[in-house]
């Protein structure tokens, strides 16, 4: 039996990003500007709670320590708390996180924590309510801010906030974000805009390197923090005068893929070795019975033989990723 997921480049995989739906109720300009549209084959049958439980059990047995539930908007699923509880059945999973647009946080975050959720990432691309509305297509800024407060009240000690960095949109907002996190335990994460199949023109207009933010941080006395083995790819910076931190995710940086530690499973049960990779390796046929666990683990481990050393974004190759709701970014 395979005991640990390792690829041909000696990278070990402790982190699973598990999409539970493609559906999202926001219309973010960099992801789903026209809103969610079912494909021509009709409504997809997303992974059931039992299938998710079997996936998480297999990955936990293969050394996974961290699972992040993604989408789409994962909290739109009516059984979201059941999904959280199913993943938390695995004691080897030390961190169970969600990436959310925050739409339901104010109402439901306490229930998520009670079910076993341990970490939250919230997408907030602007601290200006009008600009937030323009980016997301939803006038929900106050609601999302209330949700962040509710998460702290529910007992989450630190929250991560994701901001997609866009030239001419929010790249001049660093000081506003830093002021916001000065007395709040928030890790502010600036994510470089990435080119996808549907977003090439947006990328050409708005991409800006996260290095511009890094230069400003270092000049202001911020210091780099070393990552843990199940952390994501962010370069994290701290400052003694701030409760919050800043993370930079820069996929176009040299050697970005050298420390890759995550795999992805789509909402229909395909294993993706890279966000910008192949069409995926089907797992769903091995998710129907608990007795299939050994075969499932063997298939997952065998797939790693095909993982490439890096992506090809610099050549404009985004693989089969049409938009970031497809396998959860």
Swiss-Prot record:
EC number: 4.1.99.22
Co-factor note (free text): Binds 2 [4Fe-4S] clusters. Binds 1 [4Fe-4S] cluster coordinated with 3 cysteines and an exchangeable S-adenosyl-L-methionine and 1 [4Fe-4S] cluster coordinated with 3 cysteines and the GTP-derived substrate.
SUPFAM superfamilies, alphabetized: Radical SAM enzymes
UniProt-annotated binding residues for [4Fe-4S] cluster 2: 257, 260, 274
Enzyme class: lyase
GO molecular function: 4 iron, 4 sulfur cluster binding; cyclic pyranopterin monophosphate synthase activity; GTP 3',8'-cyclase activity; GTP binding; metal ion binding; S-adenosyl-L-methionine binding
Residues engaged in binding S-adenosyl-L-methionine: 30, 72, 123, 194
UniProt binding sites for [4Fe-4S] cluster 1: 24, 28, 31
HAMAP family linked to this entry: MoaA_B
Pathway the protein contributes to: Cofactor biosynthesis; molybdopterin biosynthesis
Annotated catalysed reactions: GTP + AH2 + S-adenosyl-L-methionine = (8S)-3',8-cyclo-7,8-dihydroguanosine 5'-triphosphate + 5'-deoxyadenosine + L-methionine + A + H(+)
Role of this protein: Catalyzes the cyclization of GTP to (8S)-3',8-cyclo-7,8-dihydroguanosine 5'-triphosphate.
Organism (species): Edwardsiella ictaluri (strain 93-146)
Coiled-coil annotated spans: none
Entry-linked PANTHER family: GTP 3',8-CYCLASE, MOLYBDOPTERIN COFACTOR SYNTHESIS PROTEIN A
Residue ranges annotated for the Radical SAM core domain, each copy included: 8-229
Subunit structure: Monomer and homodimer.
Positions contributing to GTP binding: 17, 68, 99, 160, 262-264
Protein name: GTP 3',8-cyclase
Example GO biological process: Mo-molybdopterin cofactor biosynthetic process
InterPro entries attached to this UniProt entry: Aldolase_TIM, Elp3/MiaA/NifB-like_rSAM, MoaA, MoaA_NifB_PqqE_Fe-S-bd_CS, MoaA_twitch, MoCo_biosynth_MoaA/MoaC, rSAM
